[in-house]
Curated annotation (Swiss-Prot):
It catalyses: N(6)-methyl-L-lysyl(9)-[histone H3] + S-adenosyl-L-methionine = N(6),N(6)-dimethyl-L-lysyl(9)-[histone H3] + S-adenosyl-L-homocysteine + H(+); N(6),N(6)-dimethyl-L-lysyl(9)-[histone H3] + S-adenosyl-L-methionine = N(6),N(6),N(6)-trimethyl-L-lysyl(9)-[histone H3] + S-adenosyl-L-homocysteine + H(+). Residues 547-687 form the SET domain. Belongs to the class V-like SAM-binding methyltransferase superfamily. Histone-lysine methyltransferase family. This is Histone-lysine N-methyltransferase set-25. S-adenosyl-L-methionine binds at residue 686.
């Protein structure tokens, strides 16, 4: 049950040098000139996250190679050095991205980019432009192993292609799918259909999953950061806990793995005008930057993919504008950039589902107009409510801001093994996407952090029980059910008459049987004290969001909402509600509810739950009523979940920490209380239906059959 998202290395797309008969000029998609030119395809090559990017001096024949796992690191380095030496004989047939001058390809290997980072192949860092070792160094080499020679010869034979236009042999990267999996260079993610099988709800066993070291995945998740603490101490790691990041002030930045985007932010000639989005680059490379920053690279990181009318795939590169879009075959993308292709399939399937629902709505519009004597075709009615989002030719178009938000926020999710997120608008008018700082983990204020450390819930289980005798309850969900301490911990911390302990089923779903939405509730997750692994069904929040989600513009009345980009079963985790964890300000007026007496008069109800007067604040009723999570400025896509009088999900307080030594910070998760279909909006109830709040003049627009008409007043 460990997450499969984010475990694969990033796929990168490579620009190939043009043949002499081609124009060789990079053009934007959807232009008339491009249809007339014979633009050659670009091949994709999967490399590690620190792979080669535009601006690096790297020959095409030196691109990603595969080595058998039994090769020791020393021999791997020596083999790579021998390949560089032998590659000089194949210089004229090397397919490297060139600057086209006078319509003739030219390969410049003498120039070394100042901004080129080191390349990473097989996990070893190699400076770009590494020269041949001295004879003294060569003399220290052990005799060549025949096994390595066979690998080199096999790679060379596979890398020869006789299909180039000038009749010369062309060197291609000798990377097969099976070798990529063995060497770890391109670890394909499990397709969404096999990860979340509707029949079992659990991860399916696939060939790619079998190749992944389970222990490595467990160790990776165990080392993932659990929070960011804002302390005056300054940046660094919190003493004695490497999973806590400490900063003096929190600022959203471009993901550390997006090297090309960070390089473009420094040197790109194109800049976005208007508002800046936190953590999203404002500058990119464009056509005019090819000669200086893109001419000598063989591998470009692919950011997104789109289907073209010709059945090809349009690749949108990280750090570059849409003016450098290129078409590739589906087979090439599937072979070398499966992650991008998989995300494209998820997005396209979501858009098609939403379009089908819009078509049904358009039919009702046509019928209504016919009753009034107005002739309206189905296509005309559909265009009034749905415009399919497709790539635009101008980098200034708001469409590309949506793509940047989708990509960079997904990259933040990948670092934690979480599923991708998408930002999509099919509204008939251009709508600027939301502006906020994205974070996949909570940002904890120092005062709230100190309060959590002093809380009774933060005590280890041994300290909590003391000398008291406790009887373990045989948990049906925990892997180590006879020694699970979660239910016993709940009994020591909370009163079961006031708080409902939502238990999990053996398949990891929360049991919402006899659930009442207005009851205080909590989910107790396992820690290392229970003796179970991270696969345990009672650790769903620790594994995080495993279903792709989409922030979708619902229209001017509701604004942005969240929709499911895959089927979600009742009881499954949707996502966590993240943001700034702070103390409830004493100066802020706390909403006091009112009820109506038998005479129809209103009176204050002091027993009603306290409400913070903010639509982005999540308060706690069980764990700590003095702490809130505010997603007004910083958070994840859960901040866009809209209200419904008949919700499909619910906020649940979660007691969760991987290790007893980790500080216990109250967390909030979103769980589905009913099956949510692909394309369906995810909603929660902002107001308890069992309490009759003072009515306001604000109309509720949830459009459910249980709608209460108007929203409560505070």
């Amino acid at each position: 049950m460990l997450p499969a998202w984010g475990t694969s290395t990033e796929a990168t797309a490579s620009h190939a040098g043009w043949d002499g008969d081609d124009e060789g000029d990079i053009r934007a998609a959807y232009t008339e000139d491009e249809k007339k030119e014979n633009i050659p395809p670009i091949s994709l090559t999967s490399v590690s996250t620190n792979g080669a990017y535009p601006g690096q001096k790297r020959r095409r024949s030196e691109s990603v190679r595969t080595l058998k796992p039994e090769c020791p690191p020393e021999e791997t380095q020596r083999l790579r050095q021998r390949r560089r030496i032998s590659a000089t004989d194949a210089t004229q047939s090397s397919r490297t991205m060139n600057v086209i001058e006078d319509r003739k390809p030219r390969v410049n290997r003498a120039r070394k980019s100042q901004d080129a980072p080191s390349t990473s192949t097989c996990g070893f860092e190699t400076p770009v432009g590494t020269k041949r070792k001295s004879k003294a160094a060569d003399s220290q080499k052990p005799p060549k192993q025949s096994k390595l020679r066979k690998i080199d010869e096999a790679s060379t034979s596979k890398a020869v292609d006789n299909s180039s236009k000038d009749g010369k042999k062309t060197t291609k990267p000798a990377v097969t799918q099976s070798n990529r999996r063995r060497s770890g260079l391109s670890l394909r993610p499990v397709p969404i259909e096999t990860i979340f099988s509707e029949s079992s709800g659990r991860e399916s066993s696939t060939e790619d999953e079998a190749d992944v070291s389970h222990q490595q995945r467990v160790e990776k998740i165990a080392k993932n950061p659990i929070m960011v603490v804002v302390l005056p101490l300054g940046p660094g790691n919190y003493p004695n806990n490497e999973r806590i990041t400490v900063v003096s002030t929190y600022k959203s930045r471009v993901n550390k793995n997006c090297n090309e985007a960070r390089r473009a932010q420094r040197h790109g000639s194109w800049s976005r005008k208007g508002i800046a989005f936190p953590g999203i680059p404002t500058k990119k490379f464009t056509k005019s930057d090819l000669a200086k920053y893109g001419a000598h690279a063989s591998n470009w990181p692919a950011q997104a993919a789109f289907r073209s009318e010709e059945g090809k795939i349009l690749i949108y590169y990280e750090g570059w504008t849409c003016l450098t879009l290129h078409r590739l075959s589906v087979e090439e993308c599937a072979r070398t950039a499966p992650t991008i292709l998989e995300e494209m399939s998820i997005r396209d399937k979501f858009i098609e589902t939403v379009k089908s629902a819009a078509a049904e709505e358009a039919k009702l519009v046509v019928e209504k107009n016919q009753e009034n004597g107005i002739e309206l075709t189905l296509d005309e009615a559909l265009k009034q409510i749905f415009i399919e989002p497709v790539p635009q030719s101008s980098p200034e178009n708001v469409f590309w801001i949506y793509q940047d938000l989708s990509y960079f926020h997904t990259m933040d999710n990948r670092d934690l093994g979480l599923a991708p997120v998408f930002y999509i608008s099919s509204y008939t008018q251009s709508v600027r996407p939301p502006c906020y700082a994205y974070t996949a983990i909570n940002i904890v204020d120092v005062d709230a952090y100190k309060r959590c450390l002093e809380s009774r819930a933060n005590m280890s289980f041994a300290d909590l029980t003391g000398q008291k005798i406790w009887m373990p309850t045989r948990s049906k969900a925990c892997e180590n059910g006879t020694k699970c301490k979660c239910d016993a911990r709940f009994m020591f911390l909370y009163d079961p008459h006031d708080v409902t302990n939502l238990e999990c089923t053996p398949d990891g779903k929360v049991d919402f049987t006899d659930f009442k939405i207005d009851n205080a509730r909590i989910v107790m997750e396992c820690s290392d004290a229970c003796g179970c692994s991270l696969d345990c069904p009672r650790r769903s929040l620790q594994r995080g969001q495993q279903h792709p989600l989409a922030v979708y513009y619902e229209g001017p009345e509701k604004g942005f909402g969240v929709r499911a980009a895959a089927n979600i079963k009742a009881g499954e985790l949707v996502c966590e509600y993240t943001g700034d964890v702070t103390l409830l300000p004493t100066s802020d007026p706390v909403a006091s509810s009112s009820t109506k007496t038998d005479d129809g008069e209103e009176q204050e109800n002091p027993e009603a739950p306290e409400r913070v007067d903010s639509s982005y604040d999540a308060a706690f009723n069980a764990m700590d009523t003095k702490i809130i999570i505010s997603a007004k400025k910083t958070g994840n896509i859960s901040r866009f979940i809209n209200h419904s009088c008949d919700p499909s999900s619910v906020f649940v307080e979660v007691y969760s920490r991987r290790f007893e030594e980790d500080p216990l910070i109250p967390r909030v998760a979103v769980y589905a209380i009913k099956d949510i279909a692909l394309g369906e909006e995810i909603t929660i109830a902002y107001y308890e239906p069992g309490i009759e709040w003072k009515r306001s003049s604000v109309k509720c627009r949830c459009k459910s059959t249980k709608c209460m008409g108007t929203l409560p007043a505070f």
